[in-house]
Amino acid sequence: MAKYDKADLERRMKGAVESLRGDLSGLRTGRANTALLDPIVVEVYGSHMPLAQVATVSAPEPRLLSVQVWDKSNVTPVEKAIRSAGLGLNPISDGNTLRLPIPDLTEERRKELAKLASKYAENARIAIRNVRRDGMDALKADESKKEISEDERKRAETDLQKLTDDIIKQADEAAAAKEKEILGK
């Protein structure tokens, strides 16, 4: 069992929150956001490449994404990848540029996305709690090896719990903000 390392535990907890923020940024909210297309992979040149490696994505208007494909021969595969990504977007081809109007979300779809945001947040909370458990186990192991006293362990556990609560609060705030954005409240 590894020694208790608060900095490492904090880094891992913050990593879970950053991962949550990344997941949340990929949820469509009815407004153009370039992160929406980040997970799209395009099959070009005989291999699968992220969209960002074959095109430039921008949001020139609040309800429009623009995908500037660098190589004209890749326009069709990029268009196909966007259509098949399940985002409900229909690219409009304009030479090397694909325009993606962002349609309004239906109330039903908004609720689905809000549930998905909640699920992402719960997964982040679980990851954070798992990190806390690892820290608690390390503290108990250190105490059993007589490397720290019982008082030091309890003090460190209290600190770790406070850190966990703070990080979970950050995750909850990120999810709540995204849900509010999705539901348009």
Swiss-Prot record:
Gene Ontology annotations of biological process type: cytoplasmic translational termination
Subcellular locations according to the entry: Cytoplasm
Top-level taxon in the UniProt lineage: Bacteria
Family: Belongs to the RRF family.
Gene that this polypeptide is encoded by: frr
Molecular function via GO: ribosomal large subunit binding
PANTHER family linked to this entry: MITOCHONDRIAL RIBOSOME RECYCLING FACTOR PSEUDO 1 (PTHR20982:SF3), RIBOSOME RECYCLING FACTOR (PTHR20982)
Organism this protein belongs to: Novosphingobium aromaticivorans (strain ATCC 700278 / DSM 12444 / CCUG 56034 / CIP 105152 / NBRC 16084 / F199)
Pfam families in the record: RRF
Primary role: Responsible for the release of ribosomes from messenger RNA at the termination of protein biosynthesis. May increase the efficiency of translation by recycling ribosomes from one round of translation to another.
GO cellular component: cytosol
KW Cytoplasm (keyword) present: yes
UniProt keywords, alphabetically: Cytoplasm, Protein biosynthesis
Protein name per its UniProtKB record: Ribosome-recycling factor
Organism taxonomic ancestry: Bacteria, Pseudomonadati, Pseudomonadota, Alphaproteobacteria, Sphingomonadales
